[in-house]
């Protein structure tokens, strides 16, 4: 029977989630054996609160966490049916944090409305070379919030393509600075131009949650340890530190 494990990690401690000897997944294989699936393949530098991995082994979370590398925790477990695909989530939530350097937040919100909905997002995707990479997807919501000297951009959708959120974050910040107009963004959606939009730095991005019709058994001790870790690393005022603090706050919400 397959099992899903909720995991949180500091993205700066690993070279991405998978695809590299120093990524997180090879460390997880040492604990679980075969990895049958994962919720998201986050890039190097991207942190996560609620990513998942699927394995064929049920293991006590206390034991798993005794073997986890520094900067990573398994804090939930759920049994799922045979054939379950963790890529087919109901919803994915991400947060991008950036320093506020005078961007017009109202313009960013106007641009965010434009980027929501169902579109061909080719201009906002880094294609990996596959011949049939799907570029049409749906973004349910983008919320732009100013908190002190930082901009928080929340994204919600069923699925995001490679580098899509970081490219949209760059575009929204560029719109707020007047580098791109809302009309420019509309044109990038109507007349897609792959490679036209750069990616914002990875360290500002956090995978907050992947939603399934699954009930997880939660290890609150692991949650608290992850929370304390993220807060302890967020003492310095930077986008990455703020992203880690937001990750800690998101973890704390699971305890309430």
Curated annotation (Swiss-Prot):
<dbReference type="GO" id="GO:0160147">
    <property type="term" value="F:tRNA pseudouridine(38-40) synthase activity"/>
</dbReference>
<dbReference type="InterPro" id="IPR020095">
    <property type="entry name" value="PsdUridine_synth_TruA_C"/>
</dbReference>
<dbReference type="GO" id="GO:0031119">
    <property type="term" value="P:tRNA pseudouridine synthesis"/>
</dbReference>
<comment type="similarity">
    <text>Belongs to the tRNA pseudouridine synthase TruA family.</text>
</comment>
<feature type="binding site">
    <location>
        <position position="94"/>
    </location>
    <ligand>
        <name>substrate</name>
    </ligand>
</feature>
<dbReference type="GO" id="GO:0003723">
    <property type="term" value="F:RNA binding"/>
</dbReference>
<feature type="active site" description="Nucleophile">
    <location>
        <position position="43"/>
    </location>
</feature>
<dbReference type="Pfam" id="PF01416">
    <property type="entry name" value="PseudoU_synth_1"/>
</dbReference>
<keyword id="KW-0413">Isomerase</keyword>
<dbReference type="InterPro" id="IPR020097">
    <property type="entry name" value="PsdUridine_synth_TruA_a/b_dom"/>
</dbReference>
<dbReference type="InterPro" id="IPR020094">
    <property type="entry name" value="TruA/RsuA/RluB/E/F_N"/>
</dbReference>
<protein>
    <recommendedName>
        <fullName>tRNA pseudouridine synthase A</fullName>
        <ecNumber>5.4.99.12</ecNumber>
    </recommendedName>
</protein>
<keyword id="KW-0819">tRNA processing</keyword>
<dbReference type="GO" id="GO:0009982">
    <property type="term" value="F:pseudouridine synthase activity"/>
</dbReference>
<comment type="function">
    <text>Formation of pseudouridine at positions 38, 39 and 40 in the anticodon stem and loop of transfer RNAs.</text>
</comment>
<dbReference type="InterPro" id="IPR020103">
    <property type="entry name" value="PsdUridine_synth_cat_dom_sf"/>
</dbReference>
<dbReference type="InterPro" id="IPR001406">
    <property type="entry name" value="PsdUridine_synth_TruA"/>
</dbReference>
């Amino acid at each position: 029977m397959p099992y899903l494990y909720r995991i949180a990690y500091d993205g700066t401690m690993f070279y991405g989630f998978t695809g590299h000897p120093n990524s997180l997944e090879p460390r997880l294989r040492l604990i679980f054996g075969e990895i049958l699936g994962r919720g998201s393949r986050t890039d190097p530098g991207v942190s996560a609160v609620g990513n998942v991995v699927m394995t064929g082994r049920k293991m006590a979370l206390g034991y798993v966490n005794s073997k986890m590398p520094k900067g990573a925790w398994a804090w939930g477990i759920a049994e799922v049916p045979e054939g379950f695909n963790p890529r087919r989530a109901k919803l994915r939530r991400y947060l991008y944090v950036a320093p506020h350097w005078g961007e017009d937040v109202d313009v960013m919100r106007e641009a965010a409305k434009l980027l929501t909905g169902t579109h061909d997002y080719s201009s906002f995707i880094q294609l990996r070379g596959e011949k049939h990479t799907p570029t049409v997807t749906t973004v349910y919501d983008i919320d732009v919030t100013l908190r002190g000297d930082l901009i928080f951009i929340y994204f919600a959708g069923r699925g995001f393509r490679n580098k899509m959120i970081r490219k949209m974050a760059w575009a929204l910040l560029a719109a707020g600075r007047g580098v791109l107009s809302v009309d420019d963004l509309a044109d990038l959606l109507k007349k897609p131009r792959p490679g036209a939009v750069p990616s914002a730095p990875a360290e500002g991005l956090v995978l907050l949650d992947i939603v399934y019709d699954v009930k997880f058994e939660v290890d609150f001790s692991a949650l608290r340890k992850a929370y304390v870790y993220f807060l302890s690393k967020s003492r310095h005022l930077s986008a990455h530190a703020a992203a880690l603090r937001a990750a800690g706050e998101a973890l704390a919400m699971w305890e309430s």
